[in-house]
């Protein structure tokens, strides 16, 4: 189905559903045009997700505009007797968000510790208003990267839906994982630096 994906991407005037009719092949598991388009979508989404230039653009965008978000995960089932006390340590982060570009290292480490202990669900998001935008700003960046826009051509809407699928299914979690690892490393380096400075001051002050 790669030829179908390439055809639609190269010629936006093509009707995707009509083009897909030519790729129906029951023996290969492509029962109808919709199945052919699903396969073509997956091929393009995978290609998009592996584009290093695009990934860097999205990573930089989410790093600059994104917020670290944490929410309380309600504990269920049999829990240790001190489970509530353990959760209470992270109460300041039960409903929390702060810009990645501004959040201090100690808060980053606290949030990530809460996630490790199963108390907090953690994500990287844009502002609530931006997250509700349709298309999502990240989807718009993907579309812009490939010169895809709604101009009335037959393939425009289908290609925009591929951008949406690529972000939601292929790229979002991957970019989020990269950013969480990046801020964790930065926060740990800062914490080590602060500890070293404090230890130095303590040793210099010793009689």
What do these predicted regions represent?
Residues 1-206:
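Duplex nucleic acid-engaging cores and interfaces of nucleic-acid transaction enzymes
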């Amino acid at each position: 189905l790669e030829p179908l994906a390439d055809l639609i991407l190269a010629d936006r005037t093509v009707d995707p559903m009509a083009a897909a009719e030519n790729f129906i092949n029951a023996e290969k598991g492509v029962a109808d045009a919709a199945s052919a388009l699903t396969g073509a979508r997956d091929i393009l989404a995978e290609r998009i997700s592996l584009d290093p230039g695009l990934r860097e653009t999205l990573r930089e965008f989410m790093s600059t505009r994104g917020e670290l978000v944490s929410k309380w995960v309600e504990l269920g089932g049999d829990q240790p007797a001190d489970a509530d006390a353990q959760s209470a340590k992270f109460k300041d982060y039960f409903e929390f968000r702060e810009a990645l570009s501004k959040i201090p290292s100690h808060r980053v480490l606290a949030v990530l510790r809460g996630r490790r202990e199963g108390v907090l669900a953690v994500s990287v998001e844009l502002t609530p208003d931006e997250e509700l935008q349709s298309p999502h700003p990240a989807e718009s960046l993907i579309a812009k990267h490939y010169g895809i826009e709604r101009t009335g051509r037959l393939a425009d809407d289908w290609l925009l839906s591929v951008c949406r699928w690529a972000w939601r299914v292929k790229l979002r979690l991957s970019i989020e994982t990269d950013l969480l690892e990046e801020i964790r490393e930065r926060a740990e380096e800062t914490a080590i630096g602060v500890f070293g400075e404090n230890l130095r001051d303590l040793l210099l002050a010793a009689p």
